[in-house]
């Protein structure tokens, strides 16, 4: 860092409008030579009102500013302290523009010589972080941030994180630092000066033994696992006792029973289904069972989970904690497909790419740092999004491996036989080939959250042809000699002529003409599909916000598909006998397109279940054609059931109507399953009430205004009495947004933050919801499971409608042919499972107390009400009007105190 002084600034303001809002708090942390040397903090008085949202966000109320100075009273002192410093902030444009305007209003011209944005720094230094919000960065790197959105604490936290980043940069190999310096010249801010100083002052020394070099890339040396040796002669019971004692957990007989049951099924190569209710401690139970099985037999166990979050928890938290508690060395490894792992040849190609783009430049710098620290090369560690992900995917698709490439998948394969536990997810479990050498090493598998397997299987058997994807794939090739792969081919042909390369001539003009025709044929194909949509019955699938056509003639589509496949075959003939790597990249892309169209053609000819989906009825570009290639039951049977000698399905919601039959029939083979139920009967369930309003009109599809108004009335009643947060679950985006609009217009919610589910933003929204004391979260099916919200007061989950899939839902259409009675055998069990998962959002531990409100009267007034009532056996149930609801809330609130 040298001896320069950095002024790390954070401002709190009345809003984000530069011309209308004021600063209400300023915090500055001064850093020199990787140390905090001074701080400055002041509240700033304003004549503007502080909006309720800002008060909730910052905990700054208007009375806190009454004795504070106006900015013009402290401006000169702040300027004097900052004028010679490097200006630093997180999302620097916001803070810099606000403080420059505030200075200008005081007749002070502030122009810092150098500006650094820590958002830019942290993206580069911490490439695997899931979020670059300050509070989440602080938590990820062990920095205490008690009061986020307070300027003094935010500035200090930003400074501490910046110091961590700079310390990390200084420890990098010199070759990596030099590359970062050259790339940093294309950043928005002045980070290149920092890298220049680091390179200039670098203490030259040989490359550390922990690194290796591939071309210009320095990467972390891969260290193979040693074959584990676990010296233990005791029983599972004593192993369990030691684990819970060392981990500070409560000894639970039901948890031990679950572990013993799993071990017994593994030892006897059985197929089993286990419903283990909330609080049974599934993860610890099956980890101990898998470990004990390995100790006794030497065999390793595959564990498949539903989410990345649970995978990370097992690998980064639970297994390391067990290692420490038991004084063992459990080798565990994340198992995925080859395409999920990086190759150094691909990184080298990306670094050499001359694409001039800010996000691509950041990605190159992230890759340089990531490859010095990743032990696995798992691409998902990078959490790529948006333009970076599109660019990276493009590079993967067109990459032809180098001769001496280093691929991290080979490391995974090499070490798989030296592990005790393999961790995978349902998608990879179902997608993996039987011939896959890694999966062949496992005879035994535990499938956690097994109730989600059918959804992943349906994704696996459904083939998709989308306009956007095909246009993107064609775009990677280009339409003329100045674009993408066609440009590379054109340059190759010129090189062949000038340098007399030993390859056959390439018909550039013929290739251009062929590509233009392929583009035209693709447009014709989707125009045909667009015409079919306009001439057909269209059904809305509101939960996914698409319009679907289920019944249509395929004759014209097949004609267009045949034409485009024929043209792709003729285009591929241009490259017969040419093996240059540039040609291989283009051939790879053309073959991908041909296979995509050919698979759809074959499925349509065979009469497989298909449907057309369109997001915007007026835009051809939003069309997708789906074809179901195989039965879900066939895939689950072949890819899961037949792959392992012993197989244990475990979930909190496997049973339906007191039976495992609904889950059993997802397999088309008459296999015997042992079935078990582990019920902990949490006391907290008895502390939770299910309230069913009697004054809400039955849901009417064509007129839901009254139904929505009733939901809002109950939300008002709840928030008025409790001042607590609330989760409201919907089965329709339309209803969710209607409720959102009403809440935003009502004065009762001025001091509440109303959050709504958004695409690809669930993690961020959950974090915001958990951070606010007064918040309402409106969500759809995504939030029926896998989401635990935190609340100090009463917890409340409101369920707008029972989570039945609509008969115009794509899943319903695709699964219909696999059941005799689709509603009874598939739709109803699915709805009950989702409802049980929704109840589980509230009950997470013994201390939870709260209320579940179900507005759907089908819960008590339908032919299947008894099945839903089974899910409520452990809850106190009450039916009544809104006054009785308020009375119940006051009773719960009194008990909570």
Swiss-Prot record:
The keyword 4Fe-4S does not apply. InterPro entries: ATP-dep_Helicase_C, DinG, DnaQ, Exonuclease_RNaseT/DNA_pol3, Helic_SF1/SF2_ATP-bd_DinG/Rad3, P-loop_NTPase, RNaseH-like_sf, RNaseH_sf. Residues 703-883 form the Helicase C-terminal domain. SMART domains: EXOIII, HELICc2. It holds the Pfam family Helicase_C_2. The keyword Nuclease applies. Its EC number is 3.1.-.-. 3'-5' exonuclease. Belongs to the helicase family. DinG subfamily. Type 2 sub-subfamily. This is 3'-5' exonuclease DinG.
């Amino acid at each position: 860092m040298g001896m320069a002084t950095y002024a790390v600034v954070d401002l709190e303001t009345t809003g984000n409008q530069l011309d209308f809002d004021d600063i209400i708090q300023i915090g500055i942390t001064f850093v020199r030579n990787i140390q905090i040397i001074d701080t400055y903090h002041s509240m700033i008085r304003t004549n503007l009102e502080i909006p309720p949202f800002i008060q909730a966000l910052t905990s700054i109320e208007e009375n806190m500013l009454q004795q504070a100075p106006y900015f013009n009273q402290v401006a000169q002192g702040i300027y004097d302290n900052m004028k010679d410093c490097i200006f630093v902030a997180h999302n620097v444009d916001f803070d810099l523009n606000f403080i420059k305007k505030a200075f200008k209003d005081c007749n002070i011209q502030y122009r810092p010589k150098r500006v650094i944005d820590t958002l830019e720094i942290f993206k580069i230094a911490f490439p695997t972080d899931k979020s670059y919000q300050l509070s989440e960065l602080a938590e990820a790197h062990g920095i205490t941030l008690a009061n986020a959105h307070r300027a003094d604490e935010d500035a200090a936290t930003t400074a501490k994180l910046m110091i961590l980043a700079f310390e990390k940069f200084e420890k990098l190999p010199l070759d990596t630092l030099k590359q970062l310096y050259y790339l940093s010249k294309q950043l928005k801010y002045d980070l290149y000066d920092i890298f220049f100083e680091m390179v200039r002052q670098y203490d030259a020394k040989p490359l550390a033994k922990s690194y290796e070099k591939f071309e210009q890339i320095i990467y972390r040396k891969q260290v193979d696992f040693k074959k584990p040796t676990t010296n233990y002669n005791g029983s599972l019971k004593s192993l369990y006792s030691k684990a819970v004692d060392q981990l500070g957990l409560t000894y639970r007989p039901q948890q031990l029973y679950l572990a013993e049951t799993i071990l017994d099924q593994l030892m006897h190569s059985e197929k089993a289904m286990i419903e283990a209710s909330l609080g049974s401690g599934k993860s610890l139970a099956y980890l101990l069972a898998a470990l004990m099985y390995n100790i006794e037999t030497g065999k390793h166990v595959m564990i498949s989970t539903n989410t990345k979050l649970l995978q990370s928890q097992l690998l980064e938290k639970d297994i390391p904690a067990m290692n420490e508690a038991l004084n063992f060395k459990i080798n565990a490894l994340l198992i995925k497909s080859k395409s999920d792992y990086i190759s150094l040849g691909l990184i080298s190609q990306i670094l050499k790419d001359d694409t001039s783009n800010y996000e691509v430049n950041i990605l190159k710098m992230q890759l340089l740092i990531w490859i010095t620290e990743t032990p696995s090369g798992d691409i998902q560690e990078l959490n790529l999004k948006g333009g970076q992900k599109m660019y990276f995917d493009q590079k993967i698709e067109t990459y032809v491996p180098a001769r001496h490439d280093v691929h991290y998948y080979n490391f995974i394969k090499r070490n798989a036989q030296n592990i005790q536990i393999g961790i995978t997810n349902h998608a990879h479990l179902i997608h993996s080939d039987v011939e896959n050498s890694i999966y062949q090493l496992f005879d035994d598998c535990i499938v956690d959250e097994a109730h989600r397997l059918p959804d992943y299987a349906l994704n696996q058997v459904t083939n998709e042809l989308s306009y956007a994807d095909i246009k993107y794939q064609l775009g990677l090739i280009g339409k003329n000699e100045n674009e993408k792969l066609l440009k590379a081919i054109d340059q190759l042909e010129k090189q062949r002529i000038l340098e007399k390369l030993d390859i056959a001539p390439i018909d550039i003009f013929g290739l251009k003409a062929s590509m233009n025709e392929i583009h035209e044929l693709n447009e014709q194909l989707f125009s045909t599909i667009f015409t079919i949509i306009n001439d057909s019955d269209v059904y809305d699938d509101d939960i996914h916000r698409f319009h679907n056509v289920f019944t249509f003639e395929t004759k014209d589509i097949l004609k267009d598909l045949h034409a485009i496949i024929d043209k792709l075959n003729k285009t591929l003939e241009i490259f017969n006998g040419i093996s240059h790597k540039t040609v291989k990249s283009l051939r790879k892309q053309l073959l991908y397109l041909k296979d995509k169209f050919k698979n759809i053609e074959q499925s349509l000819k065979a009469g497989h279940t298909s449907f057309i989906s369109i997001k915007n009825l007026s835009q051809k570009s939003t069309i997708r054609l789906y074809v179901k290639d195989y039965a879900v039951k066939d895939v689950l049977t072949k890819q899961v059931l037949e792959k392992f000698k012993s197989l244990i399905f475990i979930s909190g919601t496997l049973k339906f109507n007191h039976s495992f039959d609904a889950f059993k029939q997802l397999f088309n083979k008459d296999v015997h399953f042992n079935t078990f139920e582990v019920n902990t009967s949490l006391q907290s369930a008895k502390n939770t009430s299910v309230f069913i309003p009697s004054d809400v009109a039955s849901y009417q599809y064509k007129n839901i205004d009254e139904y929505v108004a009733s939901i809002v009335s109950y939300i008002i009643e709840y928030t008025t009495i409790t001042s607590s947060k609330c989760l409201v679950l919907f089965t329709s985006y339309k209803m969710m947004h209607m409720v959102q609009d009403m809440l935003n217009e009502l004065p009762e919610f001025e001091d509440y933050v109303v959050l709504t589910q958004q695409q690809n933003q669930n993690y961020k929204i959950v974090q915001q919801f958990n951070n606010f004391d007064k918040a309402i979260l409106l969500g759809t099916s995504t939030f029926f499971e896998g989401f635990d919200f935190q609340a100090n007061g009463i917890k409340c989950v409101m369920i707008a409608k029972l989570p039945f899939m609509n008969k115009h839902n794509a899943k319903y259409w695709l699964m219909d042919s696999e059941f005799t009675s689709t509603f009874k055998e598939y739709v109803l069990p699915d709805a009950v499972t989702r409802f049980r998962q929704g109840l589980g959002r509230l009950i997470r531990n013994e201390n939870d107390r709260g209320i579940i409100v179900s507005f759907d009267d089908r819960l008590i007034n339908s032919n299947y009400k008894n099945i839903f009532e089974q899910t409520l056996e452990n809850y106190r149930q009450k039916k009544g009007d809104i006054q009785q609801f308020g009375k119940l809330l006051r009773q719960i609130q009194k008990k909570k105190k």
